[in-house]
């Protein structure tokens, strides 16, 4: 797909999401870095390399924590650990399934449990907003996981954040 998108760009076809945007969002840590460098609010994020020092993690993040693989979409590779024991189990699973893995840990944002906002920005201007909401008490709100999309009123904060993030 990447080759097709780049080819369309070379032909001058207007795309909503170009190759640069897609490359950026495919790497969750890189996306966090770009947002943080722009002084936009992001959850505290740690990149973990094998072997992981769980005591060190516990000192730097409060539980629960969100565990993410660096790439992935549709909520795949995203887990929540309520405590150190669960984190240890998830880390062991990552070690078994992907030797030399990289994962990120993020502080859990309580207000976002089971919901998030998707903001459509076109040419630097917010064109629409949707709340994704879990329908089964999952902390993830992905529509592909059964969540639903609900139209959401665009506020000044959403207008500003959407424009800055784009």
Question: Where would I find each of the regions flagged by the language model?
Answer:
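Active-site nucleotide/adenylate-binding loops and adjacent lid/helix of ATP-dependent enzymes
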Residues: 22-106, 113-114
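Aromatic/hydrophobic pocket-lining residues that form π-stacking "cages" and hydrophobic walls in ligand
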Residues: 4, 54, 162
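Residues within well-ordered alpha helices
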Residues: 7, 34, 57, 164-166
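Phosphate-binding site of ATP-dependent enzymes
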Residues: 80-165
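A short, GP-enriched loop/loop-strand-helix hinge that lies immediately N-terminal to
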Residues: 1-26, 41-44
